[in-house]
Design a protein with these regions (language model features):
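FIC/Doc superfamily catalytic core
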Residues: 1-196
Length: 196
């Protein structure tokens, strides 16, 4: 699986999209088990969690254990969001907001149903890339978790692609400003076309 060789790039871009400024060599060093000076421990933990979540995803894909379910998303979230989110490994239990937009994600008591509906809608689309991108977007917009929603959307999107024999989609950190603006517009409208 080619994506396994790209873990450093995937982690680098993911943390930088979250506003955590690590260079590529710093991520390489950190993932080799050496701490990097000048960074908060919490930021380093986020990067390490990303790498661990990728390893788990690759392992699950090899063993045919990747599934588009709420349970699987929560399992992966327990790794990706450990000590980063208010709670990890389960859907949020109260309301959240998204900075920069007036859009309010759905109430917490609807999340399990919304996840199942999202998977049904996504898998009805013909194009595998449209399915994957829609999965990412809807996970980010619905905010199933207190935090780490976009990262989880990327994991589930890429797990779905890899499971179908397609390469991953990596969102380059160099396009952070454009990505953030498009996401804010998407949160407000729910219209996916601009993002595909």
């Amino acid at each position: 699986m080619l994506a396994q060789r790209e873990v450093v790039a995937l982690v680098h871009d993911a943390v930088n999209l979250e506003g955590i400024a690590f260079t590529f060599p710093e991520i390489q060093t950190l993932l080799d088990g050496v701490t990097v000076g000048g960074h908060k421990l919490s930021d380093q933990q986020i990067a390490i969690n990303q790498a661990k979540a990728w390893k788990q995803l690759f392992s699950d894909l090899k063993q045919n254990n990747f599934v588009l379910t709420a349970e699987y998303a929560c399992k992966l979230h327990s790794i990706a969001a450990k000590e980063d989110a208010l709670e990890w490994g389960k859907f949020r239990t109260s309301g959240v907001t998204i900075a920069g937009t007036e859009y309010l994600p759905p109430a917490a008591d609807r999340l399990a149903q919304l996840f199942a509906e999202m998977v049904d809608r996504v898998t009805m689309q013909n194009d595998i890339y449209d399915q994957a991108i829609s999965l990412f977007l809807q996970m980010a917009r619905t905010q199933f978790f207190y935090d780490v929603n976009k990262r989880m959307g990327r994991f589930m999107m890429n797990g779905h692609l890899l499971n179908q024999g397609y390469p991953v989609i990596n969102l380059p950190a160099a396009r952070q400003l454009e990505f953030n603006q498009l996401m804010l517009d998407f949160y407000q409208t729910g219209e996916e076309e601009q993002m595909k």
